[in-house]
Curated annotation (Swiss-Prot):
Disruption phenotype: No visible phenotype under normal growth conditions. Mutant plants have compromised systemic acquired resistance (SAR). Mutant seedlings accumulate increased levels of proline. Pfam families: OCD_Mu_crystall (PF02423). Belongs to the ornithine cyclodeaminase/mu-crystallin family. Keywords: Chloroplast, Plant defense, Plastid, Transit peptide. Induction: Induced by Pseudomonas syringae pv. maculicola. Induced by low water potential stress and treatment with exogenous proline. Residues 1-42 form a transit peptide. It comes from Arabidopsis thaliana. The lineage of its organism: Eukaryota, Viridiplantae, Streptophyta, Embryophyta, Tracheophyta. One of its GO terms (molecular function) is dehydropipecolic acid reductase. InterPro entries: NAD(P)-bd_dom_sf, ODC_Mu_crystall, ODC_N. This is Protein SAR DEFICIENT 4. Changing residue 205 to N: In sard4-1; compromises systemic acquired resistance (SAR).
Length: 325
């Protein structure tokens, strides 16, 4: 008799998963499995405008990764009037051998962990090893995960400065993180002028839905690593053309060159060409492409996510959960 599927709620993730563990899991398994995982273009259905349903399937052909899965996300922007989140998600994991349902887990938290850990891995490879100051641009749900991922990736970090359009939210996040005993060696504070703190950053991580450039290239100091997470459409952009022009630009996968406003816009305006993109995450991990070449290089890492990292995250969550039962 087959085992019953398990349900893994959001509250269980912190006891199952750490950002450092997931970063290492990606570093080991992305080169091994990226060519064996199929991730079709996500399907987006308008169910009643402006609300929508998104489906993101992926499956592996490797016997060492016998899984397939699908992330289902609902987007209901008017939920704020009911004091509810606008986005909800779940992830269902199946056996690719028998087709049996193995687990259903919270898709929103899975996405927060996988997105931030991809950024953490980019930082681990591209940021300077003596980086001390992290600037966090944005203070939404993803921000604390990004901060924890960068801290795990670069143990040299000693100070985190948070900026948000609403200064109070940045201050509240800084106060919350400063109470975390895991980060008692780290100084957390907030600032209301982004232009003033950008020159301080060794690593700058952005997670916003901005349609106007927030990070200006003129303020980036030599040696900075710029991590761009928020944009996923041509209308969105978190930095200006100067930042893209000054940096060595890397992507998590090639879809970023199509979807991300910072890159698609730069291509259209002739600021850079597609051939100027220095490599993707798998190429960096494998050493096929060179990352940082000197301590004064500015590196830019743009990520948009993929079904591949969703599946690898679900694999780790499921297998870790079972090992502890």
């Amino acid at each position: 008799m087959a085992a019953l599927p398990v349900f893994i709620p959001a509250e269980s993730f912190p006891s199952i998963l750490s950002h450092e563990t997931l970063i290492n899991h990606f570093r080991t398994n992305l080169p091994k499995h990226s060519s064996t995982i199929t991730s079709p273009v996500r399907q987006n259905y308008t169910v009643s405008s402006p609300s929508s349903l998104l489906l993101m399937p992926s499956w592996s052909s490797s016997s060492s990764l016998p899984y397939m899965g699908v992330k289902l996300v609902t987007y209901f922007p008017h939920n704020s009037s009911q004091n509810l989140p606008g986005i909800h998600g779940s992830y269902t994991l199946f056996s690719s051998t028998t087709g049996q349902t193995l687990a259903t887990m919270d898709g929103t938290v899975l996405t927060l962990y996988r997105t931030s850990s991809v950024s953490g891995l980019g930082s681990k490879i591209l940021a300077r090893d003596d980086s001390q100051v992290l600037i966090m641009v944005g203070s939404g749900a993803l921000a604390p995960h990004l901060i924890k991922s960068h801290l795990a990736a670069k143990p040299s970090l000693r100070r985190v400065i948070i900026w948000n359009r609403t200064p109070q939210r940045a201050q509240e996040l800084a106060e919350t993180l400063s109470k975390d005993p895991q980060h008692k060696e780290i100084s957390f504070d907030s600032h209301d002028s982004l232009d003033q703190i950008i020159p301080l950053g060794d690593i700058i991580s952005c997670a916003t839905n901005s349609t106007v450039p927030l990070v200006k290239g003129e303020f980036l100091k030599p040696g900075t690593h710029l991590d761009l997470v928020g944009s996923f459409s041509h209308e969105m952009k978190e930095c200006d053309d100067n930042a893209i022009q000054r940096g060595s630009v890397f992507v998590d996968n090639d879809t970023a060159m199509i979807e991300a406003g910072e890159l698609a816009g730069a291509f259209e305006r002739g600021v850079i060409k597609r051939e100027d993109i220095c490599g993707n995450l798998v190429e960096l991990i494998k050493g096929d492409k060179e990352g940082r070449k000197s301590s004064t290089d500015i590196t830019v890492f743009k990520s948009v996510g993929s079904g591949t990292v969703d599946l690898l995250t679900a694999q780790l969550v499921h297998e870790t959960y079972l090992s502890r039962c």
